[in-house]
């Protein structure tokens, strides 16, 4: 696993964060050291797949990056005639994802598309995964995307939505942000790395509150919505049609 050193040296002109070649190369290390509970969420996605995925259906991993969630789901699918469709708009991510997926043998076909997830038609889905993806979608487009997902899910199908959260209570928000930065420092990131990455993400990652996510999901049509995992200001929700 290549180590993330992208923000280790001072960057004079710090642009917006992008999932480019450099990020794709070190992404597994970056996300493990940056997102509290990430490995737990990936493991649980497999458990959800075991429960949600039905025969003759599709599974969508929207914002699949290098395929960790896709592989976790595929390992736990027991039903016949299932296909997984992974989508990411970063070509470097897609190329590495295809290599990663192809390194493991399985009877379950996986198709990885390089596209904007907003362009994807969701149909005959028993499970949809949005694993730290929605926060990078323009806020004005999030409701419509969730509605498309709901409409494309089969009855009793499930959506797993993992996100970084913000909190309306400023004192609590600041506390959990501090804990997150402490988590990153404990994983070997310097103050400079934490600061520069936060600045780079400011204009591209817009977080929502848990309440906002629940309201959106409810408006999309979901009636069964729960926060099943949280660590500091990161967490994951499940919504069932």
From Swiss-Prot:
Keyword Methyltransferase among UniProt keywords: no
GO BP: any one term: tRNA wobble uridine modification
Enzyme class: transferase
Gene Ontology MF term list: carboxyl- or carbamoyltransferase activity; S-adenosyl-L-methionine binding
Record's catalysed reaction(s): prephenate + S-adenosyl-L-methionine = carboxy-S-adenosyl-L-methionine + 3-phenylpyruvate + H2O
Keywords of this entry: S-adenosyl-L-methionine, Transferase
Entries under SUPFAM superfamilies matching the protein: S-adenosyl-L-methionine-dependent methyltransferases
Residues the entry annotates as binding S-adenosyl-L-methionine: 38, 63-65, 88-89, 116-117, 131, 198
EC code: 2.1.3.-
Recorded family membership: Belongs to the class I-like SAM-binding methyltransferase superfamily. Cx-SAM synthase family.
Function statement: Catalyzes the conversion of S-adenosyl-L-methionine (SAM) to carboxy-S-adenosyl-L-methionine (Cx-SAM).
Quaternary structure note: Homodimer.
Protein name: Carboxy-S-adenosyl-L-methionine synthase
Gene: cmoA
């Amino acid at each position: 696993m290549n180590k993330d050193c992208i923000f280790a040296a001072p960057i004079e002109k710090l642009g917006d964060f992008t999932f480019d070649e450099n990020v794709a190369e070190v992404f597994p290390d970056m996300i493990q050291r940056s997102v509290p509970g990430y490995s737990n969420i990936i493991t649980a996605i497999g458990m959800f797949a075991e429960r949600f995925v039905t025969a003759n259906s599709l599974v969508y991993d929207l914002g699949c990056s290098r395929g960790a969630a896709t592989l976790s789901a595929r390992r736990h699918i027991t039903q016949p005639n299932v296909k997984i469709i992974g989508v990411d708009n970063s070509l470097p991510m897609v190329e590495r994802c295809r290599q990663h997926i192809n390194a493991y043998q399985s009877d379950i076909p996986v198709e990885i598309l390089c596209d904007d997830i907003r362009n994807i038609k969701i149909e005959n889905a028993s499970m949809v995964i949005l694993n730290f993806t929605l926060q990078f979608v323009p806020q004005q487009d999030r409701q419509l995307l969730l509605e498309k997902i709901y409409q494309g899910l089969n009855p009793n199908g499930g959506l797993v939505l993992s996100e970084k959260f913000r909190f309306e209570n400023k004192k609590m928000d600041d506390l959990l942000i501090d804990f997150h930065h402490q988590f990153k420092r404990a994983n070997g990131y310097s103050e400079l790395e934490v600061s520069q990455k936060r600045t780079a993400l400011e204009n591209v990652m817009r977080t929502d509150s848990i309440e906002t996510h629940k309201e959106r999901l409810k408006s999309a049509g979901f009636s069964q919505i729960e926060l099943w995992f949280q660590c500091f200001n990161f967490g994951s929700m499940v919504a069932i049609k």
